[in-house]
């Protein structure tokens, strides 16, 4: 079996050494070279032809974003960003995903050996996924036209969306065309803590609806999208006649917290046939069982098609389980969601 060839770009010699040790400890991948800055990396890419690049966000001579933009324009390849956990870097990381990076990991606290095995497995999983991923299509920078289906504001109907690898840009593509009169949306995107607030704030600037990081106990309102906080589960709940957000630190489900299954199951319970469920690009099976529960509760369910997915894992599993009404290309999902809500199809059992 051929190994996945990886090239690391990081100005820290310690991080280059750590990444090399991690990659080479897995029998299905190898670190072919490591570069201290993008200008050195440019020559090493030509020499070693890596399949996956790990790229530091902040570096001398040329920063990670500038290099990524040039790389995706001149020699597109799967890139996993490596970022320190700061507010500034979380915003840069979100921008990197817009430019075409497949995924990202946070830098570990060097010198702390506890948890390094889990960190090694996390990096290896992201490398394997990136090696198989379809490079994402860039979403247009300008705002798309508002959709023609403009449903009346409704506090009963809502949309639940789940995504993983490639999901940040897929979610952006789904939310940007939505009018302010859209029903409420609850969204679980697999993401570590420290990044979801920047993700929500960036979407809020780009969208006509209000997008925010979800807060425990807040009322679910039409025209709003609520993003699950990193490392915390998002659920729908009821408070009298109103929907409410529930955020909690329950155990990981399908190895994930937040978990798409946790969200979808709560929506099946409390919204039933008043909901539309959407499963987007991502590795694994998180969300498949929950979407089936939504389907059985009367919700209308959609899956992103393989051709438009970065990774067709989660949608494939949901389709295989029989919980999907329609399989739709990414750029058609917004229209289909609102069409179903407007026509009342989401209310049919």
UniProtKB/Swiss-Prot annotation:
Alphabetized GO MF terms: phosphorelay response regulator activity; protein-glutamate methylesterase activity; protein-glutamine glutaminase activity
Keywords on record: Chemotaxis, Cytoplasm, Hydrolase, Phosphoprotein
Similarity-based family: Belongs to the CheB family.
GO CC annotation terms, alphabetical: cytoplasm
Species, as recorded: Yersinia pseudotuberculosis serotype I (strain IP32953)
Protein name (database record): Protein-glutamate methylesterase/protein-glutamine glutaminase
Location of the protein in the cell: Cytoplasm
Enzyme class at the top of the EC tree: hydrolase
Residues the record lists as 4-aspartylphosphate modifications: 56
Active site residues according to the UniProt entry: 164, 190, 286
Catalytic activity, reaction form: [protein]-L-glutamate 5-O-methyl ester + H2O = L-glutamyl-[protein] + methanol + H(+); L-glutaminyl-[protein] + H2O = L-glutamyl-[protein] + NH4(+)
NCBIfam families, per the entry: PRK00742.1, PRK12555.1
């Amino acid at each position: 079996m051929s190994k996945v060839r990886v090239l690391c770009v990081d100005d820290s010699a310690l991080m280059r050494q750590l990444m090399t040790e991690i990659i080479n400890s897995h029998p299905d991948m190898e670190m072919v070279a490591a570069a201290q800055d993008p200008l050195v990396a440019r020559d090493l890419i030509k020499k070693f032809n890596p399949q996956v690049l790990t790229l530091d966000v902040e570096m001398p001579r040329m920063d990670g974003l500038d290099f990524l933009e040039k790389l995706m324009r001149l020699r597109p390849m799967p890139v996993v960003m490596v970022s320190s956990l700061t507010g500034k870097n979380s915003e840069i990381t979100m921008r990197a995903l817009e430019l075409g990076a497949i995924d990202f990991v946070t830098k570990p606290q060097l010198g702390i050996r506890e948890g390094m095995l889990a960190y090694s497995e996390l990096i290896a999983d992201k490398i394997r996924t990136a090696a198989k991923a379809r490079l994402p299509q860039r979403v247009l920078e300008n705002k798309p036209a508002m959709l023609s289906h403009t449903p009346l504001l409704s506090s009963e109907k809502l949309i639940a969306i789940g995504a993983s690898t490639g999901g940040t840009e897929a979610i952006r593509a789904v939310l940007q065309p939505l009018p302010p009169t859209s029903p409420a949306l609850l969204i679980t995107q697999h993401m570590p803590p420290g990044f979801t607030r920047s993700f929500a704030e960036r979407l809020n600037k780009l969208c006509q609806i209000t997008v925010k990081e979800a807060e425990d106990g807040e009322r679910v309102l039409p025209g709003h999208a609520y993003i699950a906080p990193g490392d915390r589960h998002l659920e729908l709940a009821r408070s009298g006649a109103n929907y409410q957000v529930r955020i909690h630190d329950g155990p990981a489900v399908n190895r994930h917290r937040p978990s798409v299954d946790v969200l979808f199951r709560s929506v099946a319970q409390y919204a039933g046939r008043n909901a539309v469920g959407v499963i987007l690009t991502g590795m694994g099976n998180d969300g498949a069982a929950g979407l089936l529960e939504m389907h059985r509760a009367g919700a209308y369910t959609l899956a992103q098609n393989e051709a438009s997915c970065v990774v067709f894992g989660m949608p494939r599993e949901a389709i295989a389980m029989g919980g999907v009404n329609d399989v739709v290309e990414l750029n058609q999902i917004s229209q289909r969601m609102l069409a179903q809500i407007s026509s009342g199809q989401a209310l049919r059992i």
